[in-house]
């Protein structure tokens, strides 16, 4: 004798959507600067913009410049904004690219962030210089190491097309479009004082970020 099933739950409760969904359309540019140690994520934030309520890792696309849509399900009623951000394994916000405030009206959310440049100078300033470099290049009472000021309002003009005084080859710190003639990469890769500033994966992420930015013309973006 065959018996049919009643309306009992077939799937685990956690697979059932219980909140709103955010559908985000975005085009990634400069995917060679995709994070390696950290995670590029779609994230929902409440009133605290440093601790996400919910995150979803975004997988790296195979082709630069292709539009894609990413969804974030089960949004909390406390959600105040949807962001695309680089987030550490410990859920720390490393850098936020863009955010969209949202209302708690019960409706699903659709956002188009357009083109997102992964290798931006703002990301370099926030993720690299502000976190690791200012003690010697901006905040030291003994002066600027290498005559290089990496504070936010001066970093770009201190780097781009500026001769590095300690470069034996007379290279610029940054030569737009030419990573091989940009002394900043040599400093981070080979200089004894700087080469151990990051762990292996973190160093790969930083070097790829700066190299991609230089290859794309070193814009002040």
Q: In which residue ranges do the predicted regions lie?
A:
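Short strand-edge motifs at loop-to-beta-strand transitions and within beta-strands
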Residues: 68-70
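Aromatic- and Gly/Pro-enriched helix-to-coil junctions and flexible linker segments
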Residues: 5-22, 26-30, 35-56, 61-66, ...
């Amino acid at each position: 004798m065959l018996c049919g099933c009643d309306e009992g739950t077939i799937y685990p409760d956690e697979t059932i959507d219980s909140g709103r969904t955010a559908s985000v359309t975005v085009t990634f540019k400069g995917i060679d600067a995709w994070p390696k140690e950290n995670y590029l994520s779609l994230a929902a934030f409440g009133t605290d913009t440093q601790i996400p309520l919910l995150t979803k890792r975004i997988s790296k696309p195979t082709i630069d410049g292709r539009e894609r849509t990413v969804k974030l399900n089960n949004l909390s009623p406390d959600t105040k904004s949807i962001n695309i951000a680089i987030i550490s394994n410990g859920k720390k916000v490393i850098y936020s690219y863009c955010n969209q405030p949202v209302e708690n009206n019960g409706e699903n959310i659709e956002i188009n962030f357009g083109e997102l440049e992964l290798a931006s100078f703002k990301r370099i300033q926030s993720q690299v210089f502000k976190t690791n470099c200012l003690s010697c290049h901006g905040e030291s009472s003994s002066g600027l190491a290498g005559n290089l000021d990496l504070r936010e309002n001066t970093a770009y003009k201190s780097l781009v097309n500026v001769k590095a005084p300690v470069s034996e080859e007379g290279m610029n710190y940054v030569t737009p479009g030419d990573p091989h003639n940009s002394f900043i990469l040599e400093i981070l890769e080979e200089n004894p004082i700087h080469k151990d500033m990051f762990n292996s994966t973190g160093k790969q992420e930083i070097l790829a970020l700066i190299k991609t930015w230089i290859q794309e013309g070193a814009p002040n973006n």
